[in-house]
């Protein structure tokens, strides 16, 4: 069991290092479902850290994962890469788990600094670097899924990001007070 978890985690880590792509994952509905369930659990924790009620956090995560499913399905179906949908979704959701796990200590560091009224910007810099890495990995995954150049994957990643932000903001608006330190 631990060996299997190690292999899975190592595979997603290699995707994050741009060494593997979605084509290196199994084409399995059960594996996609497992990855999606783990993602739902981990992604629900982060909003709770910021005192968002658990039901709202679950709903937000549910909406977010459905956006990912819809955008990925639409993109690959419309470009004639229907057979790559399951592997691509598994890759995107799996690397999101990885990035959420890395983000947790950064967010906890930020909360700690806020609790002692210190702002050195370290958590923000780390978070920005993490977002940049996440965008790069998404572009890498989409490039492989579409058999295209990295630039194409990069542009599509920004469209994904924009659409996701707009939809999430329409369902779960962030008040201006929440953005002020």
Residue ranges and their predicted role:
Residues 81-155, 163, 167-168:
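Hydrophobic alpha-helical transmembrane segments and adjacent short intramembrane/lumenal linkers
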């Amino acid at each position: 069991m631990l060996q299997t978890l190690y292999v899975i985690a190592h595979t997603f880590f290699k995707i994050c290092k741009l060494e593997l792509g979605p084509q290196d994952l199994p084409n399995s509905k059960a594996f996609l479902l497992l990855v999606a369930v783990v993602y739902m659990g981990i992604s629900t924790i982060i909003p709770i850290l910021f005192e968002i009620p658990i039901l709202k956090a679950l709903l937000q995560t549910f909406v977010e994962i459905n956006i990912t499913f819809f955008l990925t399905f639409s993109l690959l179906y419309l470009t004639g890469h229907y057979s790559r949908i399951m592997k691509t979704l598994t890759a995107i959701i799996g690397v999101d788990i990885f990035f959420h796990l890395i983000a947790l200590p950064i967010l906890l560091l930020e909360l700690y600094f806020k609790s002692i009224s210190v702002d050195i910007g370290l958590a923000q810099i780390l978070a920005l670097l993490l977002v940049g890495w996440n965008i790069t990995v998404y572009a890498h995954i989409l490039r492989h899924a579409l058999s295209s150049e990295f630039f194409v994957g990069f542009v599509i990643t920004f469209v994904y990001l924009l659409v996701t932000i707009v939809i999430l903001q329409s369902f779960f608006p962030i008040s201006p007070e929440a953005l002020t330190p």
